[in-house]
UniProtKB/Swiss-Prot annotation:
A single GO molecular function term of this UniProt record: glycerol kinase activity
Broad class of enzyme this protein falls into: transferase
EC number: 2.7.1.30
Residues reported in the UniProt entry to bind sn-glycerol 3-phosphate: T13, R83, E84, Y135, D244
Name the record gives this protein: Glycerol kinase
Organism: Shewanella baltica (strain OS223)
SUPFAM superfamilies membership: Actin-like ATPase domain
Control of this protein's activity: Inhibited by fructose 1,6-bisphosphate (FBP).
Binding site for ADP: T13, R17, T266, G309, G410, N414
Catalytic activity: glycerol + ATP = sn-glycerol 3-phosphate + ADP + H(+)
Origin: domain of life: Bacteria
Source taxonomy: Bacteria, Pseudomonadati, Pseudomonadota, Gammaproteobacteria, Alteromonadales
A single GO BP: glycerol catabolic process
Binding annotation for glycerol: R83, E84, Y135, D244, Q245
Amino acid sequence: MQKKYVVALDQGTTSSRAIVFDHDANIVSVSQREFTQLYPNPGWVEHDPMEIWASQSSVLVEVLARAGIHSDEVAAIGITNQRETTVIWEKATGKPIYNAIVWQCRRSSEICEQLKAQGLEEYVRENTGLLLDPYFSGTKIKWILDNVPNARAQAERGELLFGTIDTWLVWKLTEGKVHVTDPTNAARTMLFNIHSLTWDNKLLEALDIPLSLLPEVKPSCSVYGTTRIAGEGSEIQVAGMAGDQQAALFGQLCVEPGMAKNTYGTGCFLLMNTGTKAVRSNHGLLTTVAVGPKGEVNYALEGSVFMGGATIQWLRDELGLIRDASDTEYFASKVADTNGVYLVPAFVGLGAPYWDPNARGALFGLTRGANRNHIIRAALESIAYQSKDLLDAMTKDSGVSLKRLKVDGGAVANDFLMQFQADITDVEVLRPSVCETTALGAAFLAGLAVGFWESVIELEHKACIDKHFIPNIDAENRGRLYAGWQDAVARTRA
């Protein structure tokens, strides 16, 4: 039977999804299932790895059944995933020895402080491109080995395996035959040397993690093994894998140096491809691994904003200013400007490029004339201002002045926000027709790996832009508005 489709498994922080794409990169079918968030202690976040697998495997069955697609028609399955989340399981049984420790979990802060005391902060920064932070997988692994009974002894005997979620899914799909990750996920463990593209022995030693625990690192665009849907039907190749933000970068076809995308979700993630050069950031950004036009390793600068769409949720849930996120565009457009109002949404501190955990949210410039519309508009503008902060930091680090910014995520449906983003950055903003760019990136990698598509050039002909947003304010206005934002940020940090 002719291979007509590629399936992307998009395993996220709150839900597992499966999306079927046809040869023209159109979405044919989508299935999604949420799973349980576990908070056993303050600052701790866990998932049940078996529930993740159950949700992901069920949507895979469902998405094909819903569209009436037979496994014979599927060329490949690609994977994209929440990054950093850590699973350790028994090699012999496939049984997890503990819940998955989620990227948001802060329990390994003390381990990070111990590494800093050993003088490893600069080594981590130089060799992994990351900050020494509990966000990343390495200290989570150590916590499990130190705190789960018999775990360290089992690990020393080579009886345990570690994986981020991509690795766990491939292991389950291939029925325990394949233990593998890709460079984009390996680069988020804080154990991977991004220059030699190998596991870093010094960091493994510092954290007392046996090398036998770790998966083999294979290219993001390659075949890892085969699977059968629910154990039935024809074998399908499992091929193509990348962490969620790098998958979105590839899905937007940002495969050349200087190309960038911004994902507007709960927070914002801005990534710029820097080609074959790992650019060290002096402005609070991370250096990480991306995927090049032929599936090879490229590098990227990455910056994250904590409060993007979450700011709009705050307007709705805490202030009651709107009923639905989509209402913000209507109210923001009812006023010509914010009337001097700035909202700095530092509710959990400030992310890149400031990295100030002690900053707190504030509204500035309120007068008797300020109303709901001004505050809503200021909230939307804060998302664009924070993204400009990241973009300016990337320009300083890379020496590249961006001319076009590709965007994706839920908030890109807001035309007001996208136009203001173009205005305040003086950069053309491009919104794609298919905004499921994370899943699309996984599908592209899988399809290229098995020859379903021939090259990135072919994919470029399938990528359609829904709307171009052209900068529409002058330099003087732009400078005045941004100076007001910078002043507001400085005051939240005072």
